[in-house]
Amino acid sequence: HISNGLERVGGDLNAFTTKQETVYHATVLRPDFGRAADLLTDIVFHSTYPQHEITREVEVICDEIESYADSPAEIIFDEFESMLFEGQSLGRDILGRAERLRGYTTADALRYVRRHYRTDNAVFFVYGNVDFGLVERTMRRLTMGIGAENAGSIGENAVGLPVADAGD
């Protein structure tokens, strides 16, 4: 399993999706920052999306779609958002339609990732007592040459904030 590399050192790996973002996150101790950054960038930018995994995940999503269909509150909220944000991405159902999902392929996933998962369209957020210079160097190295003309230019928009003491 892909998260074993972090779980072996007491870390945690997870992800979630909203209408505006997909978030991949890891929690690790400071010495394992490099391992977590490497794993997250590998997952985000280098996943291969084998068809059998897509098929399995599509069924999970289709089950979620069915459970939402049994929830009047969810249906009302989705309808409200669709009217409020008509013609915009925020007005679309985040889960999609089961009949369309069942035809989803590896090629579809890779096409989506190439279009949307680029370093110029990503935010790397690190908090904790980790040296900012180390974060910059690590992220620059891990994103060099990935899907954007500015790949590796992480420091351009990066902001380092002072580490607060526990007593602050």
Question: For each predicted feature, which ranges?
Answer:
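Charge-rich, well-structured scaffold segments of protease-associated domains
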Residues: 2-162
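Short, intrinsically disordered, charge-balanced linker/junction segments flanking boundaries
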Residues: 164-168
